[in-house]
Structure formats: C-alpha cells, structure tokens
Amino acid sequence: MWLGPEEVLVANALWVTERANPFFVLQRRRGHGKGGGLTGLLVGTLDVVLDSSARVAPYRILHQTQDSQVYWIVACGSSRKEITKHWEWLENNLLQTLSIFDNEEDITTFVKGKIHGIIAEENKNLQPQGDEDPGKFKEAELKMRKQFGMPEGEKLVNYYSCNFWKGRVPRQGWLYLTVNHLCFYSFLLGKEVSLVVQWVDVTRLEKNATLLFPESIRVDTRDQELFFSMFLNIGETFKLMEQLANLAMRQLLDSEGFLEDKALPRPIRPHKNISALKRDLDARAKNECYRATFRLPKDERLDGHTGCTLWTPFNKLHIPGQMFISNNYICFASKEEDACRLIIPLREVTIVEKADSSSVLPSPLSISTKSKMTFLFANLKDRDFLVQRISDFLQKTPSKQTGSSIGGTKASVSDPAPESLPTPQEASEPPASPSSPLSSPPSFSTQEIPTTSQGLLKVFQKNSPMEDLGAKGAKEKMKEESWNIHFFEYGRGMCMYRTAKTRELVLKGIPESLRGELWLLFSGAWNEMVTHPGYYAELVEKSLGKYSLATEEIERDLHRSMPEHPAFQNELGIAALRRVLTAYAFRNPTIGYCQAMNIVTSVLLLYGSEEEAFWLLVALCERMLPDYYNTRVVGALVDQGIFEELTRDVLPRLSEKMQELGVISSISLSWFLTLFLSVMPFESAVVIVDCFFYEGIKVILQVALAVLDANVEQLLDCNDEGEAMTVLGRYLDNVVNKQSISPPIPHLHALLTSGDDPPVEVDIFDLLRVSYEKFSNLRADDIEQMRFKQRLKVIQSLEDTAKRSVVRAIPGDIGFSIEELEDLYMVFKAKHLASQYWGGNRSAAVHRDPSLPYLEQYRIDASQFRELFASLTPWACGSHTPVLAGRMFRLLDQNKDSLINFKEFVTGMSGMYHGDLTEKLKALYKLHLPPALIPEEAESALEAAHYFTEDSSSEASPLASDLDLFLPWEAQALLQEQQEGSGNEDTPERREEKGTSPPDYRHYLRMWAKEKEAQKETIKDLPKMNQEQFIELCKTLYNMFSEDPMEQDLYHAIATVASLLLRIGEVGKKFSALTTKKPRDGAHSGDPNSATEEDEPPTPKLHQDPTQECQPPAAGDRQAKASGDMHLGKALQDSHVIVEGGSGEGQGSPSLLLSDDETKDDMSMSSYSVVSTGSLQCEDLTEDTVLVGGGACSPTATSRAGGTVDTDWCISFEQILASILTESVLVNFFEKRVDIGLKIKDQKKVERQFSTSSDHEPPGVLG
C-alpha cells in the first residue's frame, strides 16, 4: 500500500536491500522469508514486542537521492507480489520524469506530491463513507486479520499489550479484542503463541489479584482457563471485555447481533488510537447507565454531561453534581447518592436563559417549566455551548400544545389536593364511561373499545368512605397530607426533586390514592405514556379477534390472577386484564406472554387505568426486570444466582444448609417473578412493590435476605426441602400490613397452609426497616456487575441444556455415540454462529428464533452445509465434493426452506458413516435421483423428475421415507397408513368386527412402528435410475476413489461393475419393449416406467450397424488414462456375466446368460462408455462429455453437446447392489469404518484458527 512519505533516518539497520535504482530502494525485513536464522528470531521478537508495522508489512520502498542521507518511505507491502507491483509502477511512471530534474530537493518534492496524490485518489475511491478509524488502528486491524485469518467482516474494537500466562511462564504479546473474538499473539525467540476464543464460549470473566497473578483478568471457557496480566489500564480493558461478552450472551439469548450505530456523531478532534467501534461501545455503555439511573425510555441517547451545582430551594443549598443532556431530557444527579436527583423533560420546559454571573453564582443557567418551577444551575464550564445544545433539542421537541395538554396539569404544584389530580389517561383519547360494556365478552365492536378509566380498586371500594375506617383511615389521611406537603416543597410530577426524604416517605407507605401516580413517575412509565398518546388504544384495536399461542395462554391464566380479590371475580376486571396482556403480547411478540405477568398486571390494574397498567408493564418487562418474562426466564435465573451469592456472603452458615437442601432455587424464582405478590398477603406485598418502583431490584434482594435472616434458626433445624419450604411459606403468609385501609383479602396460600398454632405476625414495615438496616449496602452498579457474572453462567448453562435436549431428541438408531453427537452439535452451532458474524445476506439462517424448539433454533444453509460436508464426509470427492454436498443438502431439506436443522444434518452424516453396505449405497443412490439431482447438473434430470413424479406417484412415498432421510417418522407412518387405508375397502367392516370403540393412540403407535420397520427393510420401492443419472453416479464413484490408496484396484472394479450394469440396462430395455406390445387392459405391471413405455414408439433394435455408432468426444478421449482403457477393455472381453432382473423391476425375472459373442456385439458402444466413465479424470467429466450405452444413438434423447442419451435405458437399485457385491474391493471400501471424531477435531482446529483464504504470505519467522 502507498504511504504518506515519512523520513527514515537509518535505512539498513534491520532491512536488506533487494532492488535499487538512482531514486528508489526496495527492501525486505531482515529474517523474513527462508533461512532467517538467529537474526530472524531476534528481529521477529522485536517486531512483536514493539508492535512494529514490519510484522504485517515486511517489504517497503524508500525514496532517496544521491547526495542526501535522508530516506523517505513511500510504500510497504505484505507480500512480494504487492511490493513488486508498486516498484514496477514507480519505474514505469516516474523514473524518466525524475531524470529531467536538476535539483534534488525538487525531485523529493515531486515524488512526495505524486505519492500524496495517489493516496488521495485511492481514499476517494476505496474508503467507505464514514470510515474514521485512525491510520495506526487500521494497521493493527490488518495485523490481526493476517495473523488470525479473520475475514473482512470481523471488526477490531481495540488492542492492548499484555502478558498471557502459559503455565507459570508469562508470554508478552498483543491482545486483540474484536466484536466476536478474543485473540492473543506472542512471538518470543522462536516460541509462538496464537490464541483465538469466541466470546460466545466464555463461561467466566473476572478481574482478580493473587500472589501468582498480580492484577490479572481471568477468562474461562468450557475446556480451558486463561490468565492475562500486565495491562497498562486493566480497568478499561476489563470493562470492554465485559461489554463484548455481554453482547455475545445477548446474541445467544435472543439472536441480536451487533449493529454499529451509524447515527453516532463524529468527534470534533479524533482520538489517535480509538476506533469508531470503541467509541460506539463506550457510548452504548454510557447510554445504558444514563437510562437506568433516571428510568428513561430505551431509545433515549445521552448527548453529553458536565459538572455543575444545583440550587435546591427546600434546603437553600448549592448541591454539586453532574448535569446530563439528551435529546428529550435534562437530568441532574448529585455526587452524594441520596442528596438530590432531578429529571426535567424538555416537553415541560418553557424558558432557558443565562442568569447574571456573580461570585456566589458563576455561569448560572435558569430553566423554567410549565408547572411554574424554576431550576437554577451554576458553575457550568461551557455555558454558551450548553444553551445552544438545549435550544437545538427544544426545537426538535414535539409541539408545545401537545406537551401542555399532556404534562402541564400533573406537574403543577398549585393544587396539592389528590382528589383534583387529573389521571394520566387524559393524555390519550377520552376514557369510556363506567357504563360501557366492560362486562361483555371480548367480541365487542372495534368502533367503541371499552377501557377502564380508573383503577379497579376505586371502582370496588368507592362506597367505603375513609371516615368509617377509624384509626386506619386517620393514618391514611396523615400519609396523604405528608405527601401533599412534600409535593409543595419538592414539586409534583416528573420534575419533582427526588431526595432522601422521598425515599423515607415511600418506605412509610404510599397512600392508595397516590399509588398509581407515583408508580408511573418512579418507574418512568409516565414518560413513555405521554410521548405515545393513543398507542395503547391502537394496540387493543389491532389485537381484537386475533388469536395466537400467547392469547390462548392468557385465556387459560385469566381466572388464576388474584382470584381472591373481588375485582377479578367478575368480567369487569378480567376483561381489562385480558386487554392489557393481549396488547402487550402484540407489542412485544418475542416475549408474548409469560407466566407471572398476569399476577403482576392484575395488581397494576387495581391502582391505575388500563393504559397506565400497560405502560407500567412495559417498564417492568423491558427496563426494570430485563429478560425476566420470556420463555426461559433468564433474568429471574440471573437474579436468583445473585441472591445465592449474597446469601453466601452475608449468611454463610445458612447458605451451606440451603444448598444442601436445594431450597434457594425453589423459593426465589417465584419471589422475583411476582415481586412477592404470589407468596405474601396482597396488602403487604404491594408495599414492597412501592419500594421496588422507587429503588429497583435492590429492594427485592434486600427483603429476600431479610426473610432468610429472620428464619435462620428454624431453617438450620430443617431436615429436607419440604420442611424448609413450609417454614418460609408460613412466615410469608403472616407478614401483615396493619395500616392498610383495604378490606383484608385472605391469601390463598395461607388458607392452604394454616396450622393449629399460627406463627407470630410480622409487620411489613418492620420487615422493610430491617432489610434496609442490615442489607442496604447493596449498590446498583454492584448488582449490575453481579448480573453480568451470573448471566454468563446462566446462559451457558441453558446452552448446555439445549445441547443435551437436542442430542436426546436424536433417535438411538442413528449410529453416533452421545459424545460424537455433542461434538457434532457444537460444530453445527459454530457454523450457524459464523453466519451471524459474517453471513452477509443469509437472513434466514442468521436470525434464530429462541421461541422455537431447541432442535429448530440452529439451522444452516446450503453454503454452510457445503463447508461442513467437505470437512466431515468420509466420501471425499476432491473437486466434486461441493456438487455432492449440494445434492445431499437438497435431499435433507424436506420443507424446501433452504435450511436444515441438526437432526436432518446428523441423519445425512449417519447415512454415510453407519449402517451396512446396503444402507450406504442407498444413500449414495438417492443422491443421484431427484430431488437431489437438479437439471443444472444433468440435462435429462428434469425429464427424469417428471418421469418419476408424474408417471409413478405411488413411488413418491418410498423415495421420501427409506433411510429416514426425509419426513419425520410419525408423518411417514401416517402417510403410509392413509395410502393403505385408501386401498383397503374392508377396513371399516374390520373395525366394526373388532368393536365400536375407536382404537386408542397406542394402536396407532404400534402400527407406525411396524410400518417404519417394514419400510426400512425394503429396497424394492426405490425408483429406477435412467442413463444420465447413472453416468452422474459413475462420476461420483470415480472421484470418490481418486484419493484412496487402492485407487487403481477400485478403478478397475468400478469399470467392471459399470460395464455389467450398462449391459443389464440394455437387456432390461428389450424386456421393456416386449411389455409395450401387451394389450392396454392387461395385468398392471409393478414397473413404474410402464405407463410411459406404453405411450412411446417401439424401442429400436438392440443390435445396430457399427457405422451408426456415436463417435466419442475427442477431448475426453485424449485425456483418458491408457492403463485404465487396457484394464477395462480386457475386463469387457473376458467376462461371462450373469444378469438378474432383466426387466429392471427386481421381481425375480429369469436369469440370462450372455456369451462372449453377444457381449462383444452388444457392447460395441458400451465399452467406450465404461472406459470414459471409469478412467477419465474428474475435471474431464464435464457436462459436455457424453457417456452412452449400446443403444445410445436412439433419437429419443439428445444431450447438450449434440450426442445422444437413451431415455429408455434404466436400472434398479437391486441391480447396482448385486453388481457391486461381485467386487470385494468395492465392498471393502464401503464397509470400511471411519472415525468421525478425528474429522470433528480437525474441523474444530480449523474454526479455532479461522484459516480462511488470505492473500498474505505466511510469516517467515515462525520457526
């Protein structure tokens, strides 16, 4: 590649000059190439340690002038071919021009200008739009690709110098972190270490420090432990590795590949060694942290942040912290965690202005909102730029009229009375009146969609005034007054100052009249509801009358959702719950519906309208409890792992006992999935939900630890899991809320488990207080760190479970051992994942649907199958292997979706590796019949397909069933049963004789098993093979034998067999001609070709004049092997051949004995045909090479090359089998056992090294 000219002071220290002229020098790196010796080792080590560019470009061209001592590098190359091309260009285009100059400075200036011009032209043509990676980074990426054989699609994120500990010896080298792989390379004094690990294989990633490994990063996979140390910035490296491993886990979980963010703004001053991908990942990490901290929608992007102070009017202080600006929000977080947090939606902002600076308030900024609140920020470093950014975002904010109608009233502090609060559904369409047909079934009209406009609790408790509740009512009034005072001091709505006082009020309990509003604010659901007016109503309308698996599951669980609560004992609450769950299933089909969602949603509906409950559910499922509610409840399993880890840390004695009893995994899943709603009385659990919406998952973990802590002694005395579950169940049943104004609702679990001596009641507020006192040291970032660690374990455990499930689903008669099947699965999965990494447009294979059964989740397409087939098949056919692989793929692809799953893949492999000679030959035979054979491979294959599909429909089912390469066994048996049933008219009578009751499923299973066995045993149902298909089979056999040690013996044997089969086909043609003369109403022959033959003209005579013989193609004859011709000719002349099944039916036709004279007469053309088939090289057997039998000059078929092919000629599988059995060398070849384990190991090595084709020369210093 051309380089911008740079000075080189020492031109010959580590370089050898190979070519020179008066103006340029071509040099090679010392030690590169052959015979580097000690110098090569030293230079190679130096290049690796110093990360020299000479490692990837060992050739260079320098510009020099005669009197100057300064050299200028103008080009470098990774191979001699590349550098020679540049050298020749310089000689041809510059040498004559440079000789004209008199001044050497002018020469150098001209050369530099010319080179800069070439580089600019190349960049204009070749550089992709938006490529902003620095030159040094591109060089590192080139080294990585060359060293590890990575394709262009693999992007380098960053690279670091570090040590890799191999045993007790550290190897200094370079760690390359790509989107999909971790790579390491070291070369020290001839010792080379090259390592590639896929991120999806990582099972553990942690940063630790021990005496042996000071500040190291540990990377575990299923079969190795790797340690890296001596990083310049270990924190940054580990954070990036975490992020990349997380992306890989996400890919395994829901098949979301990494997509570069094209909208990421370019930096004003590009960093020297930071790639665009690294900036992208850094921005993602910041965005995720920003959204999680302030509970913002998933599409919110952080624009920037700056240090500042915020004036807080409630305590008259300037609180230091950080201001965060994004496209829709201005947020503030104090340095002290609980001091203050603020969220200002730009839709609420009315005025942003610079205030007058003073010594007390330097660079202040005032922001006013529609709710008459003013926020004063100060100590802003770049106030003018900040104001401009906010102004830009305000211009893009939706119209102010929409904003005021949505959020203006709720953010007001002028009327703190809760009764006058407008409900959030004012943001969308007017709510339906209570008299709307809510109690009717879901078959209502789409013009008037009924939705509940208020919480169900208000509907069912509106007749019980608070004054009648005595002390509880007074307590509730006090709570409401406390919150109203808080709203007056700290603001109300989204712009409220959130402080330690807010948390204190939440822990004391949210009054029921404010619960729905505060849940919406604290969870961030209010923001999404306001910005998507009418979205829920639209979803409800779209989902009306639509049925799916999710809607069926929802209907099944509707009546199990809080059945003890009066709101869900009638159709009013149930219909509302149905609509919310169905709408969410339509919004997020990847989740659809998951158990426990109904319990949580029913509680949300008690305190808010349907639309509010819907958006709270969105916040819960997609942000606050990520991956909880999917088919594999991964998120809950991850937090369960965190809970176990915390139990080990804070309750070590109990942890051992619980592990021994296996209790934690049983209890904690329901606690986390339902937020204690399913295990605790409703009025108590809802207080935990209050805290959860304010604090997040931290509260659930704290309460769970407090529950265990309160029952330590009793749990330690338990002898089994059931006893421990009873202890915890009775404790939770008696957690009460004495302040609740709701009528007590008996807990269903409590009704079932209450005993004679109920335990002491526990107040929920006492439980919460204890949980905060003992376990409040949990931090959100610590929980996220633990989540990452547990996510690796959980997802890899689920992948192992999937592997075992898939292997168990493979039938026992497939022939492979469990270990072999597991190895094959890993190879198959790796090939699928490779398509996700670099698959381009293979969209069908790339996107995996995790909701499918395990067997269907990983699938590969034809090109991927071709690669696996080439490396795993025992039938290596050289250049013909891809053709055979394509046929095998078409044979296995039953549903014609151009993808095959693991079961189909293993079935194909089994056909080649296991079974006797007959089974293997059957597999090979089918590869040369439709649908495996396609017209592009053989001209007459299309005719053959019509021949077998139209004229012999009765043969279709045996073709698709034998060898179990086609339909699943149940479908085969059902199809066979239907066919037999249609032919047996007396079946109903027979059933009536047996009895009037229909047979049970076991009867059909027995029938299917019998039919399957029968089909496996028969070989007579296979369709016949015509002449051109037979020629293709001979080609395949020839190529298959070309790499065998017994090559010549196999050639001779297959030539003999082919000549025999050609004569059998000719004799069969004579019998076919005789059958055509029979009357049409004669007995029906079992020959599938009879219908065709009756309609065709009489077949020409077998014996033809020698002058009418077709001439062989000259090209093929010139390249035929002479030795093969001699063997074949002798074999044809000396053989007495017994032919069975002359009619081609395999039905036991009379045997015929052919004399030598008949053989010579009949085989005048066959001898040439067999010689061509048996002795031509693979590359000679093209589609233009015509191989014909004795009657090949029949005018009924014409090949593409102008020769002729006899379509009347055909043979059966039995004839091929019988002929091959006459040659022991062929029998031995097909019965030879091949160990697939060795081929799997080789394939894994290939995938680990990624030895893709590369134009670069191999390194010459790898001694």
Swiss-Prot record:
Asked if the Swiss-Prot or TrEMBL record annotates the protein with the keyword Nucleotide-binding, the reply is no
| InterPro entries in the record | EF-hand-dom_pair, EF_hand_dom, GRAM, PH-like_dom_sf, Rab-GAP-TBC_dom, Rab-GAP_TBC_sf, TCB1D9/TCB1D9B_PH-GRAM1, TCB1D9/TCB1D9B_PH-GRAM2
- Site feature: Arginine finger: R556
Q: Per the entry's comment, what about the domains? A: The arginine and glutamine fingers are critical for the GTPase-activating mechanism, they pull out Rab's 'switch 2' glutamine and insert in Rab's active site.
> Does Protein biosynthesis show up as a keyword for this record?
no
Q: Where is the Rab-GAP TBC domain?
A: 509-696
CDD domains (UniProt xref): PH-GRAM1_TCB1D9_TCB1D9B, PH-GRAM2_TCB1D9_TCB1D9B
Q: Which UniProt keywords apply?
A: GTPase activation, Membrane, Phosphoprotein, Repeat, Transmembrane, Transmembrane helix
Compositionally biased residues, Low complexity: 422-447
Positions of modified residues (Phosphoserine): S412, S433, S436, S464, S1254
Q: What is this protein's record name?
A: TBC1 domain family member 9B
Phosphothreonine occurs at T397
The EF-hand domain extends over 880-915
Q: Mind telling me which residues the site (Glutamine finger) is annotated on?
A: Q595
> Source organism lineage?
Eukaryota, Metazoa, Chordata, Craniata, Vertebrata
Q: What does this protein do?
A: May act as a GTPase-activating protein for Rab family protein(s).
| Xref: Pfam families | GRAM (PF02893), RabGAP-TBC (PF00566)
The molecular function terms of the Gene Ontology recorded here are: calcium ion binding; GTPase activator activity
